[in-house]
Amino acid sequence: MRISPLGIFCWNRDLESTSQFAKQDAALTHPHPVCIQANALFAMAIAQLISSRKSTQETYEDIKVWASELKVEKTLMKAILDAPGSLPADYVSMQGWVIIAFQNALWQLLNAPSLEEGVVDTVMRGGDTDTNAAIAGALLGAAYGRDAVPKQWVEKILSCRPKAGESRVRRPRPECFWPVDAIELARSLTTLGA
């Protein structure tokens, strides 16, 4: 889930560097080979979608090639190959497992009619909804661009100020974690990556 900004940052870098950065990042806290490999593929896909504006189908075909070149684990390759025609079978009992999130994101990339419908469909399937939706949303956002994000979602994010003591705030956050500068952060990532 946290690898998406790295994919944005690497939009103008070669895919090998993007892959290595993503693997190193995953290894810090999620050293399982499947997670490391999925991280690399995901960051590469985001970077390529932003830089090349390839179609979703072309990107999916590239992901298959990259997965073969990386010699990914069988469970990950199966999820990649199954993604165009089927969603994960069980979102709930295996929630939090990268295979579920990755296969879902690929299915949404290839089948969802819009970013909004892909994210909403993901959430409606249950399980680890925030993770799965963040991953699918990042991939769809890279494919369709910032303007594909519903305006009401953007408004909610940019006005979110969960200040302690406010009547409607159940989980206050320090001001440095408020998402009010999310668009500027994304712009900064693309500028730094250039």
Report residues per predicted region.
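Catalytic phosphate/nucleotide-handling subdomain of diverse soluble enzymes
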Residues: 6, 10, 22-25, 36-44, ...
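Phosphate/ribose-phosphate-bearing ligand recognition and processing surfaces
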Residues: 1, 16-39, 53, 130
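Short, structured coil/loop segments at alpha-helix boundaries
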Residues: 32, 36, 67-81, 150, ...
